[in-house]
Amino acid sequence: MKDVKIDRKNFIPHKTTAISKEYTLGKQLGTGAFGAVRLAVHKATKQTRAVKILKKTKENVQWILDEIHILSTLSHPNIMQIFEVFEDQTNYYIVSEQCKGGELFDVISEKGGFTEKDAATVMKQLLSGVCYSHQNQIVHRDLKPENILMDNKSNDLTIKIIDWGCAQTLKKDEKLHSTDGTAYYIAPEVLKGD
């Protein structure tokens, strides 16, 4: 008997029906370089979700599909999970879990910093998520406090790594040859090409 492997991406539907048939879109939660994120309520279950809306262009379709593929592959408690994807003539809609605690950057700013214990709690989760993605040959390439969301507003400091748009899948021993990410956060050795 052959081993049976369950592949998570087989359970992430990619639909070409209108998102409005299944979700009521609400307020805008944030914007980025390539799109916006809005609150959404699933009509049948009343569960709240976040929807990343990305405009289709010739230049970015493959980039969006790569991000969808990567997010469909990863399943880790500290990586934002997606549930389904919708596509219409002009946009892709990536439906994900909603993180209600805001960006790590804002939480650090509001608190005026973290205690060593709180910093260790966040770093342990961050490293766990990054190690998991690396074990799956996926490199995020844009880790920064703005791409780490707090799952909720409680003091447990549970984080989710988001925005895998710059991520890349690598084969064993393959090296990256391009510089991606947010310039302000890029390590000097990456800028030098080391």
Positions of predicted regions on the chain:
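Activation segment signature within eukaryotic-like protein kinase domains
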Residues: 122-123
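Protein kinase catalytic-loop region centered on the HRD/HxD motif
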Residues: 128-138
